[in-house]
Amino acid sequence: GLAVGHHGLMGKQNLYDHSVRVPLMVAGPGVPKGQKIDTPVYLQDIMATALELAGLEKPDHVEFHSLMPLVRGENVRPYDAIYGGYLDAQRSVTMDGYKLILYPSIAKVLLYRLTDDPEEMNDLAGKPESLPIIKRLFARLLKLQVETGDELDLKSVYASLL
């Protein structure tokens, strides 16, 4: 998606939900109609989902998950956190109803409680009570960096969050 003026931005170069969270529709045999699921997933999950819908086995090198358990209404969360990045300019993690966005070149931290603020308009990062949440999300973000092979150094920029 495009920002089209949201947050004062015009393009796609951001990690706000209006730009990175796009609608996905699944249709086919065995797929219930009229269902809406809000669980965050990765675009790469589509391959595993398509393979399952086609009755084919997922190759071992495919790291992502089929969305069919979600589609069938099973109570699963394929990921405990969703990782995002844009070049070396931004990183994000969405977890437990929060989103942490980092701009390492300017050492900026943004925190949103998505359950209360789905439009990401009320930055909570400056509130003292948010620091434990920021640290928890930052720790998970660092683990996701390792898992994905992301070598951007966030530890030196955000040493106070360690």
Describe every region a protein language model picked out.
Residues G11, G30-P40, L53-K58, M121-S130:
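Active-site rim elements
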Residues G1-P32, Y42, R91:
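Histidine-centered active-site microenvironments of extracellular/periplasmic hydrolases
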Residues G1-H6, Q44-M47, E52-L114, E119, ...:
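C-terminal cap/loop subdomain of S1 sulfatases and analogous C-terminal strand-loop tails that border
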Residues G11-Q13, P23, K108-V109, E129, ...:
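Generic secondary-structure boundary signal with a strong preference for alpha-helix termini
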